[in-house]
Amino acid sequence: MSHNTFGHLFRVTTWGESHGPALGCVVDGCPPGLRFTLADIQTWLDKRKPGQSRFVTQRREDDLVKVLSGVMLDDDGETMISTGTPISMLIENTDQRSKDYSEIAKRYRPGHADYTYDVKYGIRDYRGGGRSSARETAARVAAGAIARQVVPGLVVRGALVQIGKHRIDRANWDWAEVGKNPFFSPDPAVVPVWEEYLDGIRKAGSSIGAIVEVIAEGVPAGIGAPIYGKLDQDIAANLMSINAVKGVEIGNGFAAAEISGEDNADEMRVGAGGDAVFLSNNAGGILGGISTGQPVVARFAIKPTSSILSERRSIDSDGKEVDVRTKGRHDPCVGIRAVPIGEAMLACAIADHYLRDRGQTGRLK
């Protein structure tokens, strides 16, 4: 299987499977001299790890990261300094239950990658989905923690803005609320609504989709490239690569089709310091594939997980018609834990384009 690497200068390769002994990543192209601690990486993994509420899978994984290469310890014994060589990180799997999947060893779960993996490779790891499992994304979050260190002043944040048909009220948006509830919701008023709704989904053994919004602030103007090297193109590709993502939009996205050119175009003025000031941000911080200096805003839609308790019609690898009912531990809404994953993938795209711009123009330090 190829295509386990993304990025151009800031390159990330992930490896490992859901029920293997470990998973991890190799980050290549990281500039030398970056200073960070293990806690700077672990903080983001702790946001993503399973088993933290009744609304996510009850698989218990500590997701403790080990940095194996690419750094030297400073004199304080805690701060790591990147050397410019590949940074390799490892996360052990400790709570696999492969026996939960024995009944689907030959059966294809509807909506899952079982059938397509078998068609393409002639073999598949049915234990938790193997490489197609969202367990792989823990490594991406670790890589994203490194990416955040590459761009000076970069702040990447995310929030869950919709579960099923239940949306947040954007008038209530408060970043301080995101870490106070199990949904990463910026709207405290919607939390009890989501709790009741997801309890019903969870008890029925079903699942539901969601929408995540990720925002990057501190992105310098001018990174990205026209035509085939667009910043938003690579952001979309990074977000689409996340398990279960079925749609991505930048800025106004699909809503731009409903408004006029007067309403959509971001007007400009000269600020007090002589810099360009935008009066709105419908473009999501990107014009012509190049950043404007405004916050970069993206949203992505996540389908309901295909692992549900209801019996579904399918076939097996012998070509027989079967009914499939998935056992095991699964997220009733995978969109919840996709928030830190989306943040990581956005950070990686921006770090990559930042380094590409620095190499091409020399204007960024």
UniProtKB/Swiss-Prot annotation:
This is Chorismate synthase. It comes from the Bacteria. PANTHER family: CHORISMATE SYNTHASE. It comes from Sinorhizobium medicae (strain WSM419) (Ensifer medicae). One of its GO terms (cellular component) is cytosol. Homotetramer. Keywords: Amino-acid biosynthesis, Aromatic amino acid biosynthesis, FAD, Flavoprotein, FMN, Lyase, NADP. GO terms for molecular function: chorismate synthase activity; FMN binding. InterPro entries: Chorismate_synth, Chorismate_synth_AroC_sf, Chorismate_synthase_CS. Its EC number is 4.2.3.5. NADP(+) binds at R48, R54. FMN binds at R131, S132, S133, N243, A244, G288, K303, P304, T305, S306, S307, R329. The keyword S-adenosyl-L-methionine does not apply. This reaction introduces a second double bond into the aromatic ring system. It catalyses: 5-O-(1-carboxyvinyl)-3-phosphoshikimate = chorismate + phosphate. Its cofactor is FMNH2. Reduced FMN (FMNH(2)). Belongs to the chorismate synthase family. Transmembrane segments: none annotated. Coiled coil: none annotated. Pathway: Metabolic intermediate biosynthesis; chorismate biosynthesis; chorismate from D-erythrose 4-phosphate and phosphoenolpyruvate: step 7/7. The lineage of its organism: Bacteria, Pseudomonadati, Pseudomonadota, Alphaproteobacteria, Hyphomicrobiales. CDD domains: Chorismate_synthase. Pfam families: Chorismate_synt. It is an enzyme of class 4 (lyase).
